[in-house]
Amino acid sequence: MTARTCSIYKNKRIVCFGDSVTQGVPHVAPADTFAAILERRLNALYGPQVQFCASNAGVGGENTAEGLARIQRDVLDHSPDLVLIEFGLNDIRYEPAKRLSEEQFAENLREMHRLIAERGAAVIFMTPTPIIGAYHVYSQGTDYYKQWGDCNGLNAIYAEIIRQVARELEAPLCDIYAAFVQEAVKAEFRGETFDYRDLSVLSRYISSRDGVHPTAAGQELIAAELYAVIVTRDLLVTRV
């Protein structure tokens, strides 16, 4: 699968590079992915002076090693101005063919950043969405994750690795994991749950069908978080 191309010229190109969260499967229409929402909101903000194209280069089921294998075709060949890197949920899968060590995961992120930066593009690292263990098939189908409490326990460790790599490389971070957890905390405040750590309260944002993929509302939340990072840091356009 290759990145979506744009039918008309635009001044700024964003490539959203990641797994099924970026792709928007299996429950989200293409127009409701964070890539599409972000494109619309940035174009609404800057109007005709600057136009944006956000290409969706998400492929479901991929870890960072598989992402690196297609980075030339799906990212670099599109001459992006900004690349959003969203991986991690498949790097922690229990199957040996998918699972990557913490060290390899971090090194793959560094290599992605190096290749993109060499082309003169900016990078935003994204942490993964939380996993709702009660709905998640991997959490229920194996004892592998018990050493971390549950699958989301390991997910949180890999989210922290992304934060560390972003700090190390002095790259912007969009902390999606923290944003979703904050929504759970707000739900606890409103009395909708007795414990925000029971992430099932996030079923509006993360599908109860699988406990991992964002719903349309979750995609909108991701887009809003990315929008905030881009416009407050003037990553693509300096606002006058």
Predicted regions located by residue number:
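Alpha-helical cap/lid subdomain in secreted, periplasmic
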Residues: I8-K10, I37-G47, E66-R239
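Serine-esterase "nucleophile elbow" of acetyl-processing enzymes
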Residues: M1-G60, A65, R70-S79
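Short, solvent-exposed mixed-charge patches
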Residues: M1, R239-V240
